[in-house]
Regions:
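N-terminal Rossmann-like NAD(P)+-binding subdomain of aldehyde/semialdehyde dehydrogenases
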Residues: 1-140, 527
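NAD(P)-dependent aldehyde/semialdehyde dehydrogenase
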Residues: 4, 288, 310-421
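Short, glycine-/Ser/Thr-/acidic-enriched flexible segments
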Residues: 14, 159, 188, 221-223, ...
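Structural signal for hydrophobic packing residues in well-ordered secondary-structure cores
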Residues: 55, 59, 74-81, 85-88, ...
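Short loop-to-beta-strand entry elements in the cores of soluble alpha/beta enzymes
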Residues: 69, 179-192, 213, 260-277, ...
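Rossmann-like NAD(P) dinucleotide-binding subdomain of oxidoreductase/dehydrogenase enzymes
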Residues: 121-292, 313-317, 527-528
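C-terminal core of ALDH-fold dehydrogenases
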Residues: 367-372, 407-503, 523-526
């Protein structure tokens, strides 16, 4: 399919404005065709209003039709897989095999949400039947369920051009909830965005879905994003990216005359605690696994382990040598774009200027273009505690080892950390018993705790929680992966003393779809 380089507004391609930009091949530095038009305020306004105008019609569609629509988005993505993967490869430099896996994840994610919608229990129906004979006051009939919020603005991520982008988890969960979406595509891979957007449009047309439920806007600067978040028709925002970007959008959402929730997934250093006994028993193999995790995807994962905490010992010295040698064997990688590389090098250089921080690897010369070599740093607990910015996210293939003098000092380091997406602990059974206090600390700090594993894999399943306390996210109760992601875009409504014919189907006495409901305090799929 020939790329058009225009906005998609209410499922129609629309060209407006004279300003534009082109994607850049990170490997060659060449500009890629075509040029993409910058969204103007009129585009943003049209998209938001179209979403609002389609909301009631979309949310009232039968759940079965909504589920088929989600499945068909996955089918349309699969149908254009060769073209989609090829374009994503030249726009991001990510290997085609990695992109094929990411596409499969994206499609399976849509299928998972379709299954959830088809089953229907996600609306969390609760029924407390009337008790008119109750004294001193009769009990009313009260029934509650979750309903969609309204149009959602989705900001695509740069590091996952498929799974966290136009047809990714935020879009899938919003559509599953019954909310229209207006996507601001990531400017580093606009062609990939357009192809995914076309797949959604094809599914909309195939299923006779209101066209206003989907729009895709292209823009490089922050002005378009700000205009989208502050548009009065937008009811929620989903964002994956930097702390500065996410916080700016969060502040905009809060500053509106009618504030809206901004679910931003932002910075995380994903600490890994390596305990003494396992360090002595399995140091070299742990080092190999850690380096694999640190350098996976050129370190451009929000779950990349950036902080390794251990207690001083001879085994630690050997472990550090293994880390160093494994890291130095890694070939340079190509980062997503020059902006990410610049931020990485600026952060790395800043860390190396701090007294008490040293470089462990051989400090290979950094390369031109978007190529990068990984880095390994070392500091001690006191330096980290005196300079907490050391524990900030450095987005790229680097990690810093924090050497502690005792178990108590390791616990103090854990207590000093800000909110995280993940926290990992490697230890033997004896280690884990001896450091049980560590888990109590980490439970307050992170959204996902891992024992004897690495954080970079994020399984797409109902039990997954991909979130964490600030600054990992703006709302530690929310997740952007797994079926619970749908709850970001739902709110409860209670119906008191409603006649059956006015109640939403999930709250009526008859339960033909056999969804799970809480009835008078007990879970049931029965009719009443």
């Amino acid at each position: 399919m020939a790329l058009k380089g225009t906005q998609i507004i209410a499922s129609e391609f629309r060209a407006s404005g004279d300003r534009g930009f082109a994607a850049v091949n990170p490997v060659t530095g060449a500009l890629l065709e075509p040029r993409f038009r910058e969204a103007c305020y009129d585009d943003i306004d049209r998209a938001a209003k179209a979403a609002a105008n389609s909301f009631d019609q979309y949310r009232m569609l039968p759940m079965a039709q909504r589920a088929i629509f989600l499945e068909d988005i996955g089918s349309e993505l699969t149908a254009c897989a060769p073209e989609l993967v090829a374009r994503a490869h030249i726009e991001t430099a990510l290997p085609e095999a990695r992109l094929e896996g990411e596409l499969a994840r994206t499609v399976n994610q849509l299928k998972l949400f379709a299954l959830m919608v088809k089953q229907g229990s996600f609306v969390a129906a609760r029924i407390d039947r009337a008790a008119p004979e109750r004294r001193p006051a009769p009990k009313p009939d009260i029934r509650t369920m979750l309903v969609p919020l309204g149009p959602v603005a989705v900001f695509g991520a740069g590091n996952f051009p498929l799974a966290f982008s136009v047809a990714g988890g935020d879009t899938a969960s919003a559509l599953a909830a019954g909310c229209p979406v207006v996507v601001k595509g990531h400017p580093a891979h606009p062609g990939t965005c357009e192809l995914a957007g076309q797949a959604i449009v094809n599914a909309i047309r195939k299923n006779h879905i209101p066209p206003g439920i989907f729009s895709l806007l292209h823009a490089q600067g922050r002005d378009a994003g700000a205009a989208l978040v502050t548009h009065p028709e937008i009811r929620a925002v989903a964002f994956t990216g930097s702390l500065s970007g996410g916080r700016a959008l969060f502040d905009l959402g809060c500053s509106r005359s009618e504030p809206i929730p901004v679910f931003a997934e932002m910075g995380s250093v994903n600490p890994v605690f390596v305990l003494p006994k396992i360090l002595a028993d399995r140091g070299p193999s742990l080092a190999e696994g850690l380096v694999e995790s640190i350098t996976l995807g050129v370190g451009q994962f929000c779950t990349s382990p950036g902080l390794i905490v251990a207690i001083r010992s001879a085994a630690l010295d050997q472990f550090l040598e293994s880390l160093k040698s494994n890291l130095e064997e890694r070939a340079p990688g190509v980062m997503l774009h020059e902006g990410i590389k610049k931020n990485f090098l600026d952060g790395l250089n800043g860390l190396q200027k701090i007294d008490g921080v040293s470089r462990l690897d051989s400090s290979r010369t950094q390369l031109d273009g978007c190529e990068i070599v990984p880095a390994l740093l070392r500091t001690d607990a006191l330096t980290l505690l005196d300079t907490p910015e050391i524990a900030g996210e450095l987005f790229g293939p680097a990690a810093i080892v924090v050497v502690c003098d005792s178990r108590d000092e390791l616990l103090v380091v854990a207590e000093s950390l800000a909110g995280q997406l993940t926290a990992s602990v490697h230890g033997t059974k004896e280690d884990l018993r001896g450091f049980h206090k560590l888990f109590g600390i980490l439970q307050r700090k992170a959204g996902r705790l891992i024992v004897n594993g690495f954080p970079t894999g994020v399984e797409v399943c109902p039990a997954m929680h991909h979130g964490g306390p600030y600054p990992a996210t703006t709302d530690s109760r929310s997740t952007s992966v797994g079926t619970d992601a749908v709850h970001r875009f739902l709110r409860p409504v209670a119906y008191q003393d409603f006649p059956q014919e006015l109640l939403p189907e999930p709250l009526r006495d008859l339960n033909p779809r056999k969804i799970w409901r809480m009835v008078d305090g007990d879970m049931s799929t029965d009719d009443l």
